[in-house]
Design a protein with these regions (language model features):
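Extreme N-terminal basic, low-complexity initiation segments
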Residues: 2-7
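Conserved RNase H-like, two-metal-ion catalytic cores of nucleic-acid enzymes
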Residues: 9-97
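Proteins with a high burden of low-complexity, intrinsically disordered sequence enriched in S/T/G/P/A and R
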Residues: 10-13, 18, 52-57, 144-163
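Metal-dependent phosphoesterase core characteristic of DEDDh/y 3'-5' exonuclease domains
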Residues: 28, 68-162
Length: 163
């Protein structure tokens, strides 16, 4: 079980956030959940805000399959990629089956943040997050917004993606 803050002698040394990203042709979102405070933090096409948030000292970020996808697309965001470059990076990984760290925008860069991948802790690496959620009787909520929509999302579409 993932606990929130990592402590040493009662002193907090790392705060843990679980995160996920969603990428569209002209929009990207990063959603963080502070597992101690139960607070959600959302960034939408805000490279500077995202960088200010993620590069603070003492933070650790976790996700599911993030070491192969989310971490590297987030690296593009942190290093100033526009939404269209972020989408190209996304498609490089998903459609072309490329390694996220080999995408030209981030190639040869050191990852700027510390993270762990929850998928590393399961025996069957073929299990999807949806299968795990189903096994736990958790609701599986998917956005109705097409990831290949070729325009900026409307306000209501953005809200659906976030929640």
């Amino acid at each position: 079980m993932v606990k929130g803050a990592i402590k040493n002698a009662g002193r907090v040394i790392m705060n843990v956030y679980i995160y996920d990203i969603e990428v569209f042709a002209h929009d990207w979102f990063v959603v963080f959940s502070d597992i101690d405070e139960k607070e959600i933090t959302v960034f939408h096409n805000d490279n500077v805000g995202l960088k200010r948030f993620m590069l603070r000292q003492g933070l650790l970020f976790g996700g599911f399959n993030n070491k192969h996808y989310d971490d590297w697309v987030t690296q593009s965001m942190l290093t100033g990629a526009d939404p269209e470059t972020v989408k190209t990076h996304n498609d490089f990984i998903i459609m072309q089956k490329g390694n996220g760290w080999e995408f030209p925008f981030v190639q040869y860069q050191k990852k700027l943040f510390k993270s762990f991948d929850l998928r590393d802790d399961i025996a069957d690496k073929g299990l999807s997050l949806k299968a795990i959620e189903g096994n736990l009787c958790q609701p599986i909520v998917e956005s109705s917004i097409d990831f290949n929509i070729n325009r900026k999302l409307t306000k209501s579409e953005a809200e659906e993606v976030i929640f």
